[in-house]
Amino acid sequence: MSIDTQAIIKKYQSKTGDTGSSNVQIALLTARIKHLTEHFKTHKKDHHSRRGLLHLVSQRKKLLIYLKDANTASYSNLIIHLGLRK
């Protein structure tokens, strides 16, 4: 299972060439988190990667807080599309 970053960027970008907006970054982090979660189902003792997962979750949380303050409508829409909790 690999992550199709170009498809995620195209889906969540606000304009052509937009790869760094909060929406795109959060969507990419969510895909990486889901990928690592599947990895841990078979590799239970991979503690080194688990530390990286916690870092990704923390980074996504910070971006979600920023997006919620900056653009509430975009935040609500993104939460629904990605299936995240508030």
From Swiss-Prot:
Concerning Pfam families, the annotation shows: Ribosomal_S15 (PF00312)
Extract one GO BP annotation from the record: translation
Which PROSITE patterns does this entry report, sorted A to Z? RIBOSOMAL_S15 (PS00362)
Where does the sequence pass through the membrane? none
UniProt GO molecular function: rRNA binding; structural constituent of ribosome
Coiled coil feature spans:
none
A single GO cellular-component term from the record reads: cytosolic small ribosomal subunit
* Family matches, as SMART domains: Ribosomal_S15 (SM01387)
Q: Which domain of life is it from?
A: Bacteria
Enumerate the UniProt keywords alphabetically: Ribonucleoprotein, Ribosomal protein, RNA-binding, rRNA-binding
Q: Which InterPro entries match?
A: Ribosomal_uS15, Ribosomal_uS15_bac-type, uS15_NS1_RNA-bd_sf
Which NCBIfam families does the UniProt entry name for this protein? S15_bact (TIGR00952)
Q: Which proteins does it associate with, and in what oligomeric form?
A: Part of the 30S ribosomal subunit. Forms a bridge to the 50S subunit in the 70S ribosome, contacting the 23S rRNA.
Family listed: Belongs to the universal ribosomal protein uS15 family.
What does the protein in this record do? One of the primary rRNA binding proteins, it binds directly to 16S rRNA where it helps nucleate assembly of the platform of the 30S subunit by binding and bridging several RNA helices of the 16S rRNA. Forms an intersubunit bridge (bridge B4) with the 23S rRNA of the 50S subunit in the ribosome.
| Entry protein name | Small ribosomal subunit protein uS15
